[in-house]
Amino acid sequence: MTNEELIAEAVKITREYINPQNVSIGHVGCALLSESGKLHLGVSIHANCDVGFCAEYGAVSSMLVTGEYKIKKIVAVHTGGTIFPPCGKCREFIYQIDASNLDTEVVLEKDKTLLLRELLPEMWQARPLK
């Protein structure tokens, strides 16, 4: 799947919805390709008391349900079509699911990707005290 096709899948699932409790649902959509080539999707939920989550969490959760852990390529897109790189929490989350995800291609533009390891040079890991 090309970057443009993956971006289009993420855009398809975004929506401008705010429920009566002022919770924003679906303003960001995420599409990822697992190692097997299967497409997984997720949307963001931003609640008032900070109990929501980024779209990447939804897409990764969808992948985990199928028994896969490795991500080949991922993109997150706002309703207006703007591509967002994963936030720091999502970068760490993707790495924590499987260390080989450091080689995940993160789509930053239609023609530009970086590996997760380039966006997360100092991932969390136990280090001995010196």
What is each model feature region?
Residues 27, 43-48, 55-58:
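Conserved mixed alpha/beta catalytic, RNA-binding, or beta-rich assembly cores of soluble enzyme
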Residues 24-34:
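Short beta-strand scaffold segments in enzyme catalytic cores
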Residues 1-20, 68-130:
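C-terminal binding/interaction regions
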Residues 55-75:
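Short, solvent-exposed cationic patches
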Residues 42-50, 78-82:
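A short glycine/serine-rich beta->alpha loop
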Residues 38-39:
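Hydrophobic "anchor" residues
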Residues 54, 58, 89-92:
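Short amphipathic alpha-helical face segments that pack within enzyme cores
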